[in-house]
C-alpha cells in the first residue's frame, strides 16, 4: 500500500540521497528558506514494528512515545517555487514495515545548480516499541526513545539517544553519536566519526578506515574487526576488548575490567592503561 501526497496539496520537499549537493547542505545549515511551505503527514503506524525514514539532505527528528500522535510536522524550504513543487514526501507500508521517503521528482528538465537548494525540516513521533531506521545522505537525523534504531549515514549527521535495545550504525564521511543504548553494532566507518557513550551491553565494530571511533562506558565485551589508519579510543569497559587487526592507526584503551587482546598490528600504536586482565599485543610487523 502506498500513500503519496500530491505536490499541489502539500508541496513536500527533499532531495534524493544521491542528489545531496553541497549548496543544499549549506543552505540547510545556514537556515536559508527563500520559498517555504508548511508540511504535515499522518503516518500509517497501525501494526508497524519497523519505521524506515529515507531523508537524504533534510532534517528529521523522531521521538518514541507510548501514545504518539504519529504525525510529521514542519516546513519545506527551497531556492525557487519550481523546486519546491518538484519535491515529494511519500509513505508506503509492507507488512509491519512503514517506509517514509523524501525525494525529488526527476521528471522534466529542471536542473540543480550551485545556488539551488531544497530541504525539509520535520519533527514527529512514533510508538516507543518500534525499530527506527534512518537513512541519511547529507542531512541530519535525531532519534530518541525507541526500542531499537539504526543509522546509515553518508556525509550527514545522526544522533541516537535513549535507545532501549540495539543500535546499528554505518557511516561514510559523516558523524554518528550514540548516547544510552542497550547494545551497539557498527558495521563500518569510512572517514567519518562515531562517538558512543553509555552502552548497556556488548559492542561490535566491523571496520574503521581513516575515521575515528570513541567509546565511553560499555557493560559487555568490545569486539573490533579491523582498524586502518584511523583512531579508536575506548574508556570504561566492563568486559574484554579484542581487536583482529590494526594497520597504521592508533588504539587507546583505558579502564577495562577484562582482557585486552590484539591479534595483529602494523605500524600503528596501542596504548593500554588500567586493564585488569591480561594484555596481549603483538610486535609491529
Question: How does the language model describe each region?
Answer:
Residues 1-7:
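N-terminal secretory signal peptides that target proteins for export/translocation
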Residues 9-21:
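Bacterial N-terminal signal peptides
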Residues 25-136, 142-153, 157-171, 175-188, ...:
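Acidic (Asp/Glu) and glycine-rich low-complexity loops/linkers
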Residues 60, 193-194, 212-213, 231-232, ...:
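Short loop/beta submotifs within extracellular cysteine-rich repeat domains
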Residues 233, 239-242, 252, 258-261, ...:
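Extracytoplasmic/luminal low-complexity segments enriched in Pro/Gly and acidic/polar residues
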Amino acid at each position: 500500500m502506498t500513500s503519496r501526497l500530491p505536490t499541489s496539496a502539500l508541496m513536500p520537499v527533499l532531495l534524493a540521497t544521491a542528489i545531496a549537493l553541497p549548496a543544499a547542505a549549506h543552505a540547510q545549515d545556514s537556515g536559508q528558506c527563500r520559498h517555504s511551505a508548511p508540511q504535515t503527514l499522518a503516518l500509517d503506524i497501525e501494526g508497524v514494528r519497523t519505521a524506515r525514514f529515507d531523508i537524504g539532505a533534510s532534517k528529521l527528528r523522531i521521538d518514541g512515545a507510548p501514545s504518539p500522535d504519529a504525525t510529521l510536522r514542519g516546513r519545506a524550504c527551497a531556492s525557487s517555487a519550481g523546486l519546491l513543487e518538484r519535491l515529494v514526501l511519500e509513505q508506503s507500508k509492507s507488512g509491519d514495515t512503514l517506509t517514509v521517503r523524501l525525494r525529488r521528482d526527476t521528471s522534466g528538465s529542471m536542473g540543480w545548480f550551485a545556488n539551488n537548494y531544497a530541504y525539509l525540516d520535520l519533527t514527529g513521533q512514533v510508538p516507543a516499541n518500534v525499530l527506527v531506521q534512518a537513512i541519511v545522505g547529507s542531512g541530519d537525523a535525531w532519534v530518541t526513545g525507541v526500542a531499537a534504531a539504526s543509522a546509515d549515514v553518508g556525509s550527514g549527521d545522526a544522533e541516537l539517544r535513549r535507545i532501549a535495545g540495539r543500535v546499528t550504525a554505518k557511516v561514510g564521511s559523516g558523524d554518528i553519536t550514540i548516547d544510552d543504548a542497550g547494545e551497539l553494532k557498527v558495521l563500518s566507518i569510512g572517514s567519518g566519526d562515531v562517538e558512543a557513550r553509555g552502552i548497556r551491553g556488548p559492542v561490535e565494530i566491523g571496520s574503521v578506515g581513516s575515521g575515528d571511533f570513541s567509546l565511553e562506558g560499555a557493560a559487555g565485551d568490545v569486539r573490533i574487526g579491523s582498524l586502518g589508519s584511523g583512531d579508536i579510543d575506548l574508556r570504561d569497559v566492563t568486559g574484554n576488548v579484542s581487536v583482529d587487526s590494526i594497520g597504521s592507526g592508533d588504539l587507546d584503551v583505558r579502564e577495562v575490567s577484562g582482557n585486552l587482546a590484539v591479534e595483529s598490528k602494523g605500524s600503528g600504536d596501542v596504548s593500554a592503561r588500567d586493564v585488569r586482565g591480561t594484555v596481549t599485543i603483538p610486535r609491529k610487523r
